[in-house]
A protein has these predicted regions:
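A conserved ligand/cofactor-binding region detector
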Residues: 1-217
Length: 217
């Protein structure tokens, strides 16, 4: 209810069975309750339809290195396959295309589509390609799952909340916190591009942030 785990492309997809493992083995949840939490917590963004973002891993690699994760993956895949066969009335062309484990491979993108409550591309065109081509059969099953979210960084979180000293300088130079709701107000900084006092403050803030980060690391 309070947190989301965002999967950016398929590289971190094993977070899905790992979260299941924690909920099952550490927290003692039943399978259904754990799966309910996972499928309301994890979301998936696909940035490109190239193979590098639609990873497939040899099942033997996962089985040997992560045996408990493999057990959980097999159960997720088996349950999902039963759902697919029921939904598509045994159409094996669609079932095989959407299967999580097939021909000795674990298909990470299909695992994301199975488990994530939201799937999005990063532009209107890209999102349409996902719906009409890459994940078309999944889209016909759960059209509400597929969304379009433009990629970007939100200044309220990544500037105001996380960098309070820079936030204070921006507010001082632009006349208050108007930029939080109207980011175009940041253009007010342009008039200080040759102001050595402001530039010195900016440099000092950057150095201090780097020192704090280095100390943390």
């Amino acid at each position: 209810e309070k947190h989301v785990i965002q999967i950016n492309d398929t590289h971190p997809t094993l977070v899905i069975p790992e979260l299941m493992r924690i909920l099952l083995d550490v927290e003692g949840y039943s399978w259904n309750d754990a799966w309910n939490i996972v499928t309301h917590t994890v979301a998936y963004t696909n940035h490109t339809v190239l193979a590098e973002a639609l990873e497939r891993w040899p099942q033997g690699l996962i089985e040997n290195l992560l045996p408990r994760i493999w057990q959980i993956l097999k159960e997720i895949a088996a349950r999902y396959q039963r759902t697919l066969e029921q939904h598509f009335h045994g159409d094996q062309s669609k079932v095989s295309k959407m299967a999580i484990i097939w021909n000795g491979e674990v298909r990470m993108a299909n695992l994301c589509v199975c488990a994530c409550y939201a799937v999005n591309g990063v532009s209107a065109l890209h999102s349409e390609i996902l719906k009409q081509d890459v994940f078309h059969d999944a889209y016909t099953m759960r059209p509400e799952q597929f969304k379009n979210v433009t990629n970007g960084v939100d200044h309220r979180r990544w500037l105001s909340q996380i960098n309070p000293k820079l936030d204070a300088l921006v507010k001082e130079c632009t006349g208050g916190d108007d930029y939080l709701l109207h980011p175009e107000a940041i253009r007010g900084l342009e008039k200080y591009k040759d102001d050595q006092s402001v530039l010195s403050q900016l440099e000092a803030i950057k150095k201090e942030n780097k020192r704090r980060f280095a100390a943390y690391v």
